[in-house]
């Protein structure tokens, strides 16, 4: 399942974030790549623990934990602290699959990467190239969203970032360990939750709503890992 989550940050917020990122000191993006990924990764990144990355990441997570679409689709259990990157001057990241488990620097906590997310801080017209290409059971998707919007997709997906040939592409990326490990099960629960919400709005007193909601929670109880 690939999902577009619009408006995580407002236009004004994105403008302030981008202005701060343009003044930041960047490091080689290979610092957080695995052995194979490092061969394919050609970008810049704020180091883990950088104060600006922590500030932006905390604001992102605060918004996402209050975002019904993210909560319904991801069913989050743990989140790897968001990282910030920049692609410019031909920067790219060839096809790869993210590491299955990530461990934040200086933390004993491990996060299984069930879901990957990219939140854009640059508008599509700000740069040439830089499309996020995601290959999975839903086919090949090319993603280039407005600043402030986010894409959520399975961590098992083969994906890449095309070379940026003009301008700069600023974004944040992170991983989520879901309460439900299997993508097809999460997708089923997401569709069912959406149907329940629509029925609650359209026919709030329908007696079948109680049974349908009960079925949702029984499936969640069967599949959840805590």
Curated annotation (Swiss-Prot):
Q: Which residues form the Fe2OG dioxygenase domain?
A: 78-178
Q: How is the cofactor bound?
A: Binds 1 Fe(2+) ion per subunit.
Q: List the Gene3D superfamilies.
A: q2cbj1_9rhob like domain (2.60.120.620), Rabenosyn, Rab binding domain (4.10.860.20)
HAMAP family per record: Hydroxyl_YbiX (MF_00657)
- NCBIfam families membership: PRK05467.1-3, PRK05467.1-4
E.C. number(s) listed in UniProt: 1.14.11.-
What SMART domains would the database entry show?
Answer: P4Hc
Q: Report the protein name in the record.
A: PKHD-type hydroxylase PFL_0865
Assigned keywords, A-Z: Dioxygenase, Iron, Metal-binding, Oxidoreductase, Vitamin C
Keyword Iron listed? The answer is yes
Q: Which InterPro entries match?
A: Oxoglu/Fe-dep_dioxygenase_dom, PKHD_C, PKHD_hydroxylase, Pro_4_hyd_alph, Pro_4_hyd_alph_FE2OG_OXY
Pfam families (UniProt xref): 2OG-FeII_Oxy_3, PKHD_C
Report the record's Gene Ontology biological process terms. DNA damage response; intracellular iron ion homeostasis
MF (Gene Ontology): 2-oxoglutarate-dependent dioxygenase activity; iron ion binding; L-ascorbic acid binding
Which cofactors, if any, are listed as required?
Fe(2+); L-ascorbate
């Amino acid at each position: 399942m690939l999902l577009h989550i619009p408006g995580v940050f407002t236009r004004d917020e994105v403008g302030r974030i981008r202005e701060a990122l343009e003044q930041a000191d960047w490091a080689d993006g290979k610092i957080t790549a695995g052995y194979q990924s490092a061969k394919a990764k050609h970008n810049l990144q704020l180091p883990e623990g950088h104060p600006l990355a922590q500030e932006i990441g905390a604001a992102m997570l605060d918004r996402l934990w209050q975002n019904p679409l993210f909560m319904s689709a991801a069913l989050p259990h743990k989140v790897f602290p968001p990282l910030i990157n920049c692609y410019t001057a031909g920067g790219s990241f060839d096809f790869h699959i993210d590491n299955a488990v990530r461990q934040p620097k200086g933390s004993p906590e491990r996060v299984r990467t069930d879901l990957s997310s990219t939140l854009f801080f640059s508008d599509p017209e700000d740069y040439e190239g830089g499309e996020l290409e995601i290959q999975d059971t839903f086919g090949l998707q090319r993603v280039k969203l407005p600043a402030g919007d986010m894409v959520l997709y399975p961590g098992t997906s083969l994906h890449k970032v095309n070379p940026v040939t003009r301008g700069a592409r600023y974004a944040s990326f992170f991983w989520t360990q879901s309460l439900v490990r299997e993508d097809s099960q999460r997708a089923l629960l997401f569709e069912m939750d959406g149907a329940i919400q629509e029925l609650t709005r359209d026919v709030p007193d329908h007696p079948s709503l109680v049974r349908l909601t009960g079925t949702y929670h029984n499936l969640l109880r069967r599949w959840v890992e805590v």
